[in-house]
Each structure stands twice: as C-alpha cells, then as structure tokens.
Regions:
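ATP-dependent carboxylate activation and anion-phosphoryl transfer catalytic cores
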Residues: 225-293
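Structural detector of well-ordered beta-strand residues that form the stable sheet scaffold
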Residues: 89-90, 117, 140, 176-178, ...
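Conserved N-proximal alpha/beta basic substrate-recognition cap immediately N-terminal to
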Residues: 8-118
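Phosphate-binding site of ATP-dependent enzymes
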Residues: 150-238
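Short, hinge-like loop/turn segments at secondary-structure boundaries
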Residues: 22, 46-49, 107-109, 135-136, ...
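Extreme N-terminal starter segment of soluble prokaryotic enzymes
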Residues: 1-4
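ATP-grasp fold ATP-binding core
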Residues: 106-110, 132-150, 172-183
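Rossmann-like NAD(P)H-binding beta-loop-alpha module
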Residues: 112-136
C-alpha cells in the first residue's frame, strides 16, 4: 500500500495524518501541489519532486494553494488524472472544486432543499448595489473562493456598500453577497467522515465571525438528529468523503447551512472534543480500499 499526502510538509494536519497512517503500519511522504509534474507520454504520468504519484493507492489532499487561473486548473486536472489512473484521491477533485466555490455550494444546498441564506452573485457594480438592497441592507460580502473567514466583510449601510463595491470593481472581483443571519455570535462545525458525523463543536466568538482561525473558541456539542441530517446531506451535495460543515444556529431556533469545507481543518475540533478526525479519516479510507494492516 502506497500513500502520499499533498499538503504542507511538517504542518499540523499533515503530521496528524502521517501519525494516523503510522498506527496502521503505513508511511506517507508529503509534497506540495506546486511540485507536481505531469507527462502526457511516458512515465510517471504524474510525479511530485521526482517521486511518482500515479502508482499510489491513496493520495490525501490537504492543501490547494491560491494561484493563477492556469495554476489552479492544472492542479485540479492533475488530481483528475490521478483518479483516472485508479488512485483514490481524498477528497476527490470534483468535491474540492465544489466546496471551494461558494456560489456553487450555496446553489446546490438550496436546490437540495437545505436551509441556506439568500445569496446573490454578480459582476457589475450596479447589480451589486441592487442586491444589497434586495437582501435587506445587512449583508456579508465574501470572496467567491476563500477560507478561514479571510476577506469577508459585513455591510450595514449604503455608503459603505458603495465604497466596498467600487473597490471590488477596481480589482475585477465577483460580488458574492449573502444576507446576514443573526446567530448570537456562535456557529456549529460538524465533521463528517464516510457518511457519519464523528464530532461537532459550537464555536463562540467576540464578533460576528465565528471561524476558529479568527479567534472563536470551540466547545463540544452533542448534535441532534436535525443537525446530523443537515450535515450528512450537505456533505453529499458536494460529493465529499469528509467535510467540515458550517451551520448557523439562528436566533429563531432554526439552522442555516453556510459552507461545506472539503479540505477541512480539524485542529480546533480535536482541542474542543478530543475527536481524532485524522484517525477516523484514515480508518475509513483504508477500509474502503480494502487495507487490513
């Protein structure tokens, strides 16, 4: 059994995966996706830092860095070719693409009947101002691609909307506006692996951003049946084998599914709940591929 990890060498998540694999008697080398070299003819068809990857049984994807359009497309194509050659890529290229795209995820969640905030995406300044008004004059503006709460701003007045939208226009950005959902400065992260919720935490923050990377503090949460159902359905919508599903407990007692993270972090979950997500993920994948070591 040959396993590799695409991620940050020495990073916490990478090392936790390597530790979980070692407990099963497997070693895994770690490479950055920026080290990928693909060959249309000859072998290896795909390598990283000269090491072949197309003879791997499993490749765990822990990071796809930001880059130019060409770089991102090439990296995702490389993952697809690995899958085409029979390598188990976790998560799949398609799931990663779906999860990173906030518009696509929101649209799929809505179409699947899951509760998710009203969202409007557009390219023109005038349409963005109209969307701000349509969504009630209290919105969260997000980058279409992003994570950890970076680049997200809340806008509650027209003057600020005008200035922010003009700045985004200069940067030739897409406008992604989502209605603000009152949530008591807390949200829920449910972690899904292999069709089950292995753990959940409530994240409390000083402000409206509830990402652990933005300083929110996690505490263990026993998910109810409704929360489990929403989390599993959300992960299925994007085709994720494992996912961190972010859900807002609304002030009216209902839930809103915000995002489905398909390269999810689990460090805060481990600290809050003691759940070893890396071990759960490794055990699930090895069972799926028939490894009994």
């Amino acid at each position: 059994m040959k396993v590799a990890i695409l991620g940050q060498r020495g990073g916490w998540h990478t090392e936790s995966l390597r530790g979980a694999l070692a407990r099963r008697g497997l070693a895994a080398e770690c490479y950055s996706v920026t080290q990928l070299t693909a060959r249309v003819t000859g072998r290896p068809r795909l390598s990283a830092a000269t090491a072949p990857l197309d003879d791997c049984d499993v490749v765990f994807v822990r990071a796809i860095p930001m880059g130019s359009l060409e770089q991102v497309i090439y990296r995702m194509d490389a993952l697809r070719m690995l899958e085409h050659d029979g390598v188990r890529v976790v998560n799949s290229a398609l799931a990663i693409e779906h999860g990173v795209d906030k518009y696509y995820t929101s649209a799929r969640l809505h179409d699947a009947g899951l509760p998710t905030p009203r969202t409007i995406v557009c390219e023109r300044f005038e349409e963005a101002l109209a969307a701000y008004e349509e969504l009630g004059g209290d919105v969260v503006v997000k980058p279409l691609f992003g994570s950890e709460g970076k680049g997200i701003v809340r806008i509650t007045d027209g003057d600020t909307a005008y200035r922010v939208f003009r700045a985004l226009e200069l940067g030739r950005s897409i406008y992604c506006l989502q209605e603000f959902v009152p949530h008591g400065r807390a949200d829920i992260r449910a972690f899904v692996v292999g069709g089950r919720v292995i753990g959940a935490m409530l994240r409390r923050a000083q402000g409206w951003k509830t990402n652990a990377s933005q300083g929110a503090k996690g505490e263990p949460l026993e998910p109810d049946e409704r929360l489990i159902d929403l989390s599993l359905r959300a992960a299925r919508v994007v085709g994720a084998e494992h996912a961190g599903v972010d859900i807002l407990p609304r002030d009216d007692g209902e839930y809103s599914v915000i995002e489905v993270n398909t390269i999810p972090g689990w460090r805060a979950l481990r600290a809050a709940t003691g759940v070893d997500a890396a071990r759960c993920l490794v055990d699930h994948v090895l069972e799926e591929v028939g490894w009994s070591g």
